[in-house]
Design a protein with these regions (language model features):
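Eukaryotic adaptor/scaffold assembly regions
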Residues: 1-82
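Per-blade loop-tip surfaces of WD-repeat and WD-like beta-propellers in eukaryotic adaptors/scaffolds
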Residues: 69-78, 113-145, 152, 164, ...
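Beta-strand-rich domains and repeat architectures in extracellular enzymes and scaffolds
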Residues: 83-109
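Canonical WD40 repeat/beta-propeller blade segments in eukaryotic WD-repeat proteins
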Residues: 88-94, 153-159, 196-204, 241-249, ...
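Loop/turn segments within WD40 beta-propeller blades
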Residues: 93-99, 158-164, 202-209, 248-254, ...
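Conserved strand-to-loop turn within each blade of WD40 beta-propeller repeats
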Residues: 105-108, 170-173, 214-217, 259-262, ...
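Eukaryotic modular interaction domains in large regulatory/scaffold proteins
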Residues: 287, 328-383
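Blade-level signature of beta-propeller repeat domains, shared across WD40, Kelch, NHL, RCC1
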Residues: 380-410
Length: 410
């Protein structure tokens, strides 16, 4: 309760004093117990209310959780299964909602789509067997299933349509392009939207009918994917004051979140397009690099160029947990992302200076072991599979690495 109420130092001291194991996450359970106790003194129906409030959802939910055992692997247990190379720095990536496909984008203006099952099969096949493959077999088994060329400048962001075989891409060439990747022969986009500024970020609505776009401009765009009509919020005074750097829909589609160079995080109503809350100077005024929602849409996870990762509770509009220990040598030069793993037990964040993966227990901010990411340059993108223990890292060293936690064989 102390942790939840913002008394982080007191909570840690008390936790150390009573030797709490595992460490206690922030929770308002004590407040709720007292509240229900007072209610039950007045009416006997209080116990029914408690029962109705105990059903836990999947993923992180600090409102109901007490002692949750992590069943998924920490970051240090993953290993590289496949590496693909571009001809320039690789700074964009995306995971399909099925967890079966990955896309990577580069400064060389190309996009690759990779098959996860093929990458896993390739890593499990002995080199001598791969050497014996015919050219036809090699092509059929190759993890890169599509290479798309239609941008004329750096690919900055990617997102898969949730239900159709469509990939959306944004670029510094001022365009958003839509690729139909189910046809092997197609390398060009079937539709292009010309923007007024370089495109920085985009996010598909969970239905796939709308696309959020952030460009080198303070105004967030919302495109109808069927008509390609553009909408913007009708109250400019509440918008960002500097270019938008990150956009993300909530899984329940009721909200979306944005971050900006102005240092603010804004949460918007997904229907009215109006700002409903603003976290001012969310990262001490530094640029906000990423925002993402928890699966139950109750929390926003963010990171900024102050090298801090924060969990925000939307019901109270405040920062609930700060994950510290990354970027010990100072502020970040490049942007990166903080992501949940597939079970939301852990939070992954690439440390720019050490090129290693920082990992925390999402509920109590306990630092886990570091994982060396093996890149020869800063990691510019990290994305975790929504369905299994796998993630992708894209780097300034022109490479994208696919990581997977292999099941124990003993």
């Amino acid at each position: 309760q102390l942790f939840y109420d913002g008394h982080q130092q007191l909570a840690v001291q008390l936790s150390n004093l009573v030797k709490a194991h595992p460490a206690c996450p922030p929770s308002d359970r004590l407040f709720k117990v007292v509240k229900f106790g007072l209610e039950s003194e007045e009416e006997l129906s209080g116990s029914k209310k408690i029962e109705q409030n105990i059903a836990p959802g999947s993923g992180i939910d600090l409102e109901y959780e007490t002692d949750v055992q992590s069943i998924s692997p920490e970051g240090a247990l993953y290993e590289t299964c496949y590496v693909t190379a571009h001809k320039g720095p690789c700074r964009a990536g995306a995971f399909h909602s099925s967890g079966k496909l990955i896309a990577t984008g580069s400064e060389d203006a190309s996009i690759k789509i990779l098959d996860v099952d093929r990458m896993l099969a390739k890593s499990a096949t002995p080199a001598e067997i791969i050497a014996m493959e015919t050219p036809q077999q090699a092509m059929e088994n190759h993890p890169v299933i599509r290479t798309l060329y239609d941008h004329i400048d750096e690919v900055t962001c990617l997102d898969f349509h949730p239900t159709h075989s469509i990939l959306a891409s944004g670029s510094t060439d001022y365009s958003i392009r839509f690729f139909e990747y189910s046809k092997p022969s197609v390398k060009k986009a079937y539709k292009s939207i010309q923007e007024a500024a370089p495109v920085r970020c985009l996010s598909f609505h969970p239905s796939g009918d709308f696309l959020l776009v952030g460009a080198d401009h303070p105004t967030v765009r919302l495109y109808d994917v069927n008509t390609f009509q553009c909408f913007v919020g009708r109250n400019p005074s509440t918008h960002h004051t500097l270019p938008v750097t990150t956009v993300k829909w909530s899984p329940n589609a009721n909200l979306y979140a944005t971050g900006s160079l102005d240092g603010d995080i804004k949460v918007w109503d997904g229907v009215s397009n109006l700002v409903i809350s603003t976290f001012k100077k969310a990262h001490d005024g530094e640029e906000v690099c990423s925002v993402t929602f928890s699966r139950n849409s109750k929390y926003v996870l963010s990171c900024g160029k102050d090298s801090l990762v924060k969990l925000w509770e939307l019901s109270t509009n405040r920062c609930l947990i700060v994950y510290t220990g990354a970027g010990m040598t100072g502020k970040m030069q490049h942007g990166a992302q903080a992501v949940f793993n597939h079970t939301e037990d852990y939070i992954f964040f690439p440390d720019e200076n050490t090129t290693s993966l920082c990992c925390w227990d999402s509920r109590n901010a306990e630092r886990q072991r570091l994982l060396a990411l093996g890149h020869n340059g800063a990691v510019r993108y990290i994305g975790h599979s929504p369905t299994g223990p796998a993630f992708i890292t894209c780097s300034e060293d022109f490479r994208a690495r696919f990581w997977y936690r292999k099941a124990d064989t003993d």
